[in-house]
Amino acid sequence: MQKGKGRTSRIRRRKLCGSSESRGVNESHKSEFIELRKWLKARKFQDSNLAPACFPGTGRGLMSQTSLQEGQMIISLPESCLLTTDTVIRSYLGAYITKWKPPPSPLLALCTFLVSEKHAGHRSLWKPYLEILPKAYTCPVCLEPEVVNLLPKSLKAKAEEQRAHVQEFFASSRDFFSSLQPLFAEAVDSIFSYSALLWAWCTVNTRAVYLRPRQRECLSAEPDTCALAPYLDLLNHSPHVQVKAAFNEETHSYEIRTTSRWRKHEEVFICYGPHDNQRLFLEYGFVSVHNPHACVYVSREILVKYLPSTDKQMDKKISILKDHGYIENLTFGWDGPSWRLLTALKLLCLEAEKFTCWKKVLLGEVISDTNEKTSLDIAQKICYYFIEETNAVLQKVSHMKDEKEALINQLTLVESLWTEELKILRASAETLHSLQTAFT
């Protein structure tokens, strides 16, 4: 029997994915999904495998209507259902996009269309799809500043970069929006507001599927690879599954095939990629429980926190680590400190007379028992520091949840991120304790 295809593996996957037959509540009867299915059917989409449902933990997703086998098609969405830059250029916006200089980016074209169609309300041909899109998102760019301040430092920095990027995107697009005034009775400033563009940006950023790059003269040279895929984008992420997803040029459909088995009435998942929880939070606004790719990042400042300040070779050691790419992506994971983190610590812990052995350290060679033990001791101190910091943040979040009810959803999300990181740190502490016993 092939690995991962037996009964035990399926049971394990069900536990990890958190789905069961009794837990999903079918939502096919809801008016928004009835309208969406009519809309999709008119665009040649036929599907009997999946049904919209609400699941605890993951929220709205898609439930299997029948047993699904390995290699079976989960969903095949015709090109006529996809929202791409072709859709936008064929629309009333096409003439304005074509004549605007410099050419708008593919992302701006998609975002402009989403805002315009949402503003159109019941007059929009895309209304059934727009109705099921989230009204708000939980990416860091959408969070209140006081909530962003609670994020791990590395994620907070990326969140602030993300916010600056979206703000610049809005500022640089305002002249283009002004050119669209002839299309609207209302002032375009009230339609294409920052909040409206932020919603559209998050919609594309969190829900788009990847298409082969295309190039159009009327659009900028940025990669034109995004498409919104109605209904298909209800599939939630699990790091424990694998699928094959791509646009089929022969059938002109975006297709997803499963490499797993699904029982009837289980939630069907896809995998957005082997992302850690900080990446999932940043890009999609959620945290994955039991994520095997989850980790805790160690910054340069923390890396040297417990090293002797009297080490005259420290600057040189840091320079070597930087030159060889060992100053970034140093982590604690479910299995303990990463090889990269331990390697960096071993080099930093080299005694003066052993410093010339630094190349051997980077190659994974053992220099001495003393060096091995010292690096493990430092790793343990860093791990305990993180555990203490994480507990302090979780306590702060708990107090804020009591005091600021309006932010409870945002705070709960941040709390889940820190809770997962605490689990990882505790697992790493146990691993380090086991490794240290070899030197006692």
UniProtKB/Swiss-Prot annotation:
GO terms for molecular function: histone H3K36 methyltransferase activity; histone H3K4 methyltransferase activity; histone H3K4 monomethyltransferase activity; histone H4K20 methyltransferase activity; histone H4K20 monomethyltransferase activity; histone H4K20me methyltransferase activity; transcription coactivator activity. It catalyses: L-lysyl(4)-[histone H3] + S-adenosyl-L-methionine = N(6)-methyl-L-lysyl(4)-[histone H3] + S-adenosyl-L-homocysteine + H(+); N(6)-methyl-L-lysyl(4)-[histone H3] + S-adenosyl-L-methionine = N(6),N(6)-dimethyl-L-lysyl(4)-[histone H3] + S-adenosyl-L-homocysteine + H(+); L-lysyl(20)-[histone H4] + S-adenosyl-L-methionine = N(6)-methyl-L-lysyl(20)-[histone H4] + S-adenosyl-L-homocysteine + H(+); N(6)-methyl-L-lysyl(20)-[histone H4] + S-adenosyl-L-methionine = N(6),N(6)-dimethyl-L-lysyl(20)-[histone H4] + S-adenosyl-L-homocysteine + H(+). GO terms for biological process: chromatin remodeling; inflammatory response; methylation; positive regulation of inflammatory response; positive regulation of interleukin-6 production; positive regulation of transcription by RNA polymerase II; positive regulation of tumor necrosis factor production; regulation of cell proliferation in bone marrow. The keyword Nucleus applies. GO terms for cellular component: cytosol; nucleus. PROSITE patterns: SET (PS50280). It is an enzyme of class 2 (transferase). Its EC number is 2.1.1.-, 2.1.1.364. Residues 1-16 have a biased composition (Basic residues). S-adenosyl-L-methionine binds at residue 272. CDD domains: SET_SETD4. Residues 48-273 form the SET domain. The keyword Transferase applies. Pfam families: Rubis-subs-bind (PF09273), SET (PF00856). Residues 1-24 are annotated as: Disordered. InterPro entries: Rubisco_LSMT_subst-bd, Rubisco_LSMT_subst-bd_sf, SET_dom, SET_dom_sf, SET_MeTrfase, SETD3_SETD6_MTase, SETD4_SET. It is found in: Cytoplasm, Cytosol; Nucleus. Keywords: Cytoplasm, Inflammatory response, Methyltransferase, Nucleus, S-adenosyl-L-methionine, Transferase. Forms a ternary complex with TBK1 and ZNF268; the interaction with TBK1 is ZNF268-dependent and leads to TBK1 monomethylation. Protein-lysine N-methyltransferase that methylates both histones and non-histone proteins. Via its catalytic activity, regulates many processes, including cell proliferation, cell differentiation, inflammatory response and apoptosis. Regulates the inflammatory response by mediating mono- and dimethylation of 'Lys-4' of histone H3 (H3K4me1 and H3K4me2, respectively), leading to activate the transcription of pro-inflammatory cytokines IL6 and TNF-alpha. Through the catalysis of TBK1 monomethylation, may regulate virus-induced interferon signaling. Belongs to the class V-like SAM-binding methyltransferase superfamily. SETD4 family. This is SET domain-containing protein 4. It comes from Homo sapiens. The gene is SETD4.
